[in-house]
Amino acid sequence: MRLPPQVNERIDRSTNVQFAFNGKSIEAFDGDTVASALYASGMRIFSRSFKYHRPRGLLCGAGHCPNCLMNVDGVPNVRTCITPVREGMVVHHQNAWPSLNNDLLSVNDKLDFLMPVGFYYKTFTHPRVWKIAESVIRRAAGLGVVPEDGSSVVE
């Protein structure tokens, strides 16, 4: 769903760009950001909140919030609201499984009474328990997977 053409708009509607989002081909215009192209294609949920996995849509559009963080060409935590689309780029969602619309960990929202602020620091105090709990909690937080070879580290 696109707005009608505007005077002084930043996109070039005469030049199409294609990229992949979660394996699906998305049409964009030259000058689109990844997030604006996804929004124009009908997407409304861009991420999930860290603890309760509540749905998050576009918020700031300026790269100042975590709502649009995605994996772009293998690099985690890219702010897609300020990242221009490029032909052939590959984008994947983060912090939701199996999909953004149907995230199984969104059940955490219904179990919030079991997870007050800081519960993990008070509950998993034994070193052996914390070692296991830490990896589960970090994975649930969903801030992407950092490649072990450092191939996508931005300097």
Label every model-predicted segment.
Residues 18, 36, 43, 110, ...:
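Generic intrinsically disordered, low-complexity segments enriched for polar/acidic and small residues
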Residues 33-36, 84:
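Short, structural beta-strand-to-alpha-helix junction motif
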Residues 27, 35, 67:
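Short, electropositive, low-hydrophobicity segments enriched in small/polar residues
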Residues 1-29, 41-64, 72, 76:
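Ubiquitin-like/PB1-type beta-grasp interaction modules and other compact soluble beta-rich domains
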Residues 55, 61, 66-155:
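Fe-S ferredoxin-like electron-transfer domains
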